[in-house]
């Protein structure tokens, strides 16, 4: 029976997978998403969490050739439209992301740049609570970050 088959399907890990996180917050784990369109759509999923503080943690997108700067600018811009707090990961990689967010006049005191995912989670832990939802978007290995 088709209904039974569909009901028994398991979501693909790290693809918009919803989990509990720090201090009772909600985590949208989209760590395996590394394409521009999918990353923007993941932010749109985040936007649907009404009455919650919205956070994104992302190193941006890589290996896009001449499109890389523009795609990361667009990701930062869209994050600024949706999020209350933004944490970019990678000191040297985050410039186009930050430019995009700042083009929307995102408050600088709500924008953080972490050197690693570990540091990003430490920053996040400072304001995580049951009314917070965080999107973990594209979990790059540390060798790409700086």
Spell out what each predicted region is.
Residues 3-146:
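ATP-dependent carboxylate-amine ligase
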